[in-house]
Every structure is written in structure tokens, then in C-alpha cells.
Regions:
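Short conserved active-site loop signatures built around small residues
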Residues: 1-30
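Conserved PLP-enzyme active-site core in the AAT-like
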Residues: 2, 67-263
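Conserved N-terminal alpha-helix of the aminotransferase class I/II PLP-enzyme fold
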Residues: 27-30, 34-82, 98-107
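PLP-dependent enzyme catalytic core of the Aspartate aminotransferase-like
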Residues: 150, 245, 310, 326-370
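A common structural junction motif
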Residues: 223-224, 311-322, 365-370
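Short, well-ordered beta-strand elements within core beta-sheets of diverse protein domains
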Residues: 235-244, 291-299, 346-351
């Protein structure tokens, strides 16, 4: 495939079967636990055509080689396992709570040590990365929406020998390519925007370093953290429409952010697309769009925020994101969420519905819950 194609074209055409007479236009799931001897697969845990197609597509979008996993957390666990026993990871203070919980568990078990900092504080992170084995970046962060200076942090990681990992779930490969910004590894919860329909659980890791790719693929193979063929195929099918879905969802998010900024019950809107947002300048520098996730705060009233989530009719009160339907939740309803996330913070994962309908439902909930 030509290297000068727009990512919105690559996402449609990458990973398809060779165009020969009578070949299928698209890849199909292969339901087999083993293969006839003589090839490089040998067993179902070693490869599947549906994985290969998804990995090839994600690899072309991110600029590396992909490895898919049974879930985003399986991908996280495989990457963290690259850190030697007794090693140290520098991680964000705010990030997906499942990742932070896993790091805490490994630290408590004596497997490694973890330093958690404000990932938007570049100077502090650069100082902390000296002597670290891995720097874990999430940008924008979940759910605080902080934006890291990926090029500066990646450069610091290279200088000190730390492996730099970027969780690109919120931005997707269409809005941000961390490998081109200097990262060593990029990972996704492909459950979210990649698959895009809230019907499959998947993870993915992409790297341009052959040694890292081999080490990560070996961990997937050894741990058995493989995606099922149907799940991989659903992920690929969803990925084909990412450009269209993201364009609409991002437009909706920007529309809602502006409306919410003026609402009397909303004390803060966290969205890097807003010119006054602390992460706006960085987002402009390293992203081609601001994404479809935003968070709002409601004057410190956690009970009110919870009632808002329970009063919506169109917005789904659920804990995921990246699907075609809009979802919202108060993140502190989860005991696992870090205590520095405000009690009244609601994360809005914006879908592809008509923006006027989304706003009317949200505005009604803000009023009804009072």
C-alpha cells in the first residue's frame, strides 16, 4: 500500500486479502485451534488470520508492528512484564484506574516500584525518569484529561534508557501517533474507539522495535492472552469506520464542551479542545484533533453528579467509552478510582448521535437532578 495515503484511507484498506481472482474482499475469522504441520503457526495460540489483519492495520496506522491481546489489561500486563524484577516504572498520577491498580499490586508484591506523578508536569517527570526502567504515559489522561508533552518525555526516556510507553486509547491512531513523537511502545484498549461498538473486549500493542515486538509477542503466546478469532474480526470490522465515527463524535464533543462551559451548574469543563484548557497548546502541537472525551465538574457536589448520571435518557450510564452511543459516569463511584479525582467529576464519552439531542438530554438531567 502506498505510504502517502491519508490515515482515513489506510484504516479502510490495510490488512485486506491479496487481490486475486475469487479472493474475498475482506478478511474472515478462522475458527481453528491448530494447523496442518509444516508452517510457522503450528498451534492456535501462535497466530490467526483475523489477528494478523487487525495487527497489520493498526501497525500501518501507528507506524510499527502490532500484537493484539484478549483485552487492554492483558496488553498492559505484557508490557509491564518487560520491566525486570526490582525495576522501577514512572507512571501518571491520573490514568485508567485498572492500570494504576495493576501497578500497585505489583509494587505491593515486591515485583517492582512505582513513582506516580502529574504527567503534565514535564520537569518533574523528566527528573523522575532518571534511573527508571519504564515511563508510562497516558495522554490525554483518563479521566482528568491532562495532556503530556510526549516528545519531551520520550526524549528524556531515550536519554536515560527508559522504555517509553504511551496509552493512546483516548486519542486513537487517527489523532495522535506516539511512535512518531519518540515513544517506544504504543498501546490501546481496542475495546474502545478501535472496535467502536461496545460489543468486544480487545487490546493492542504496537512498536517499531523488532526486539520489543518479539518480547511482547512471546508474552502473549506464553501467557495465552490471545484474542478469539471472532473478537479480532469484530475489532477489525469496527476499525474500518473509525474515521467517520471519530469525526462525528469529536464534533459532538466540541459542541457539548462549549455549551457546558456556559452552564451555571458546571464549575469546570476538562477538554483540550477549549482554548483556555491547560493542555490546549500541547494538544495542538502533537494531535490532529482533540478527541471525543471530556470531563465536567459540578461545584464539588458528588451526590448531585451521581443523580445527573442517573437522570439521563439518551446518555447511557455505563463505564466504557468509544462506542457509537454516548456514555457518562461519575468516576469516583468506583472505589478503585484515585482519590485526587474530584467526587463531582463526570466523564462524558461522546458518541455519534445528533448533538442537539445529546445536549437536550444532558441539559434536562442537569436540571432534573437539582
Amino acid at each position: 500500500m502506498a505510504s502517502d495515503l491519508d490515515p482515513s484511507t489506510v484504516v479502510v484498506h490495510a490488512g485486506r486479502p491479496e487481490r486475486v481472482p475469487n479472493a474475498p474482499v475482506g478478511e474472515s475469522p478462522v475458527f481453528s485451534s491448530t494447523y496442518v504441520a509444516g508452517g510457522d503457526r503450528g498451534y492456535g495460540r501462535f497466530g490467526n488470520d483475523a489477528w494478523t489483519a487487525l495487527e497489520e492495520t493498526l501497525g500501518q496506522l501507528e507506524g510499527g508492528r502490532g500484537v493484539t491481546f484478549a483485552s487492554g489489561m492483558a496488553a498492559v500486563a505484557a508490557v509491564c512484564d518487560l520491566v525486570p524484577v526490582g525495576g522501577r516504572i514512572v507512571a501518571p498520577q491520573h490514568a485508567y484506574s485498572g492500570v494504576l491498580a495493576l501497578l500497585d499490586q505489583q509494587a505491593e508484591a515486591g515485583r517492582l516500584t512505582v513513582d506516580r506523578l502529574n504527567i503534565a508536569d514535564t520537569e518533574a517527570v523528566v527528573q523522575a525518569v532518571t534511573g527508571a526502567d519504564m515511563l508510562w504515559i497516558e495522554s490525554p489522561t483518563n479521566p482528568a484529561m491532562e495532556v503530556a508533552d510526549i516528545p519531551a518525555l520520550a526524549a528524556a526516556g531515550r536519554q536515560t534508557g527508559a522504555t517509553v510507553v504511551v496509552d493512546n486509547t483516548f486519542a486513537t491512531p487517527l489523532l495522535q501517533q506516539p511512535l512518531s513523537l519518540g515513544a517506544d511502545i504504543v498501546m490501546h484498549s481496542a475495546t474502545k474507539f478501535i472496535s467502536g461498538h461496545s460489543d468486544v473486549v480487545l487490546g493492542a500493542v504496537i512498536t517499531a522495535d523488532d526486539d520489543l515486538w518479539t518480547a511482547i509477542e512471546l508474552r502473549r503466546r506464553s501467557l495465552g492472552a490471545i484474542p478469539g478469532p471472532m473478537e479480532a474480526w469484530l475489532g477489525l470490522r469496527g476499525l474500518r469506520t473509525l474515521a467517520l465515527r471519530l469525526e462525528r463524535a469529536q464534533s459532538n464533543a466540541a459542541f457539548l464542551a462549549e455549551r457546558l462551559l456556559r452552564h451555571p451548574r458546571v464549575s469546570r469543563v476538562r477538554y483540550p479542545g477549549l482554548p483556555d484548557d491547560p493542555g490546549h497548546a500541547r494538544a495542538v502541537a502533537q494531535m490532529s484533533g482533540f478527541g471525543a472525551i471530556l470531563s465536567i465538574e459540578l461545584g464539588g457536589d458528588g451526590d448531585y453528579a451521581q443523580r445527573v448520571c442517573e437522570c439521563t435518557e439518551l446518555w447511557v450510564h455505563a463505564t466504557s467509552l468509544g462506542g457509537v452511543e454516548s456514555m457518562l459516569e461519575r468516576r469516583r463511584r468506583w472505589p478503585i478510582e484515585v482519590p485526587t479525582i474530584p467526587e463531582d467529576l463526570i466523564r462524558l464519552a461522546v458518541g455519534i448521535e445528533h448533538p442537539d439531542d445529546l445536549w437536550a438530554d444532558l441539559e434536562r438531567a442537569l436540571k432534573t437532578a437539582t
